[in-house]
């Protein structure tokens, strides 16, 4: 795989009328969607805590909007492929250690925990359109694949 090079930062997004209409329609449903995502999140945590799936903890000072549900697995790319083979899409949100790009790290600091996320963090479906059957399929599949692949051994160093 080719290494991505980031030379500068910036933004070029310009909202158009159709995007503005989408945002307005979404805002009108936000409370309902948030409740659904929160319920899914709580269900996942309850099941996964009892099945040995390592869930990314949220800092005590934050309130999650549950737009992602992140777990740690020993090999996130293999995990995502195995999930895909079972018909479940995962997202690999944490794919780069941005502190390694000079344009994004002007003070030349290191962020050692970032490499852990790059190697182990994968997000499973947690959106408001999931049916109960789909949620249960995600849970069952995550638990089976997690039992095969395992969890990373160095997670304790992140939160100690």
Language-model segment annotations:
Residues 1-160:
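PLP-dependent aminotransferase class I/II
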């Amino acid at each position: 795989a080719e290494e991505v090079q980031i030379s500068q930062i910036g933004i070029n997004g310009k909202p158009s009328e159709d995007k503005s209409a989408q945002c307005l329609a979404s805002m009108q449903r936000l409370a309902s969607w948030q409740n659904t995502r929160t319920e899914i999140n709580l269900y996942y945590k309850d099941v996964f805590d009892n099945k040995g799936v390592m869930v990314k903890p949220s800092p005590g000072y934050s309130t999650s909007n549950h737009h992602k549900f992140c777990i740690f697995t020993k090999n996130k790319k293999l995990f995502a492929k195995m999930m895909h083979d079972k018909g479940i899409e995962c997202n690999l949100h944490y794919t780069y250690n941005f502190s390694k790009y000079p344009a994004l790290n002007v003070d030349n600091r290191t962020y050692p925990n970032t490499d852990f996320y790059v190697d182990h963090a994968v997000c499973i479906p947690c959106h408001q359109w999931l049916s109960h059957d789909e949620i249960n399929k995600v849970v069952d599949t995550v638990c089976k694949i997690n039992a095969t692949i395992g969890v990373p051994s160095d997670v304790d160093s992140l939160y100690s």
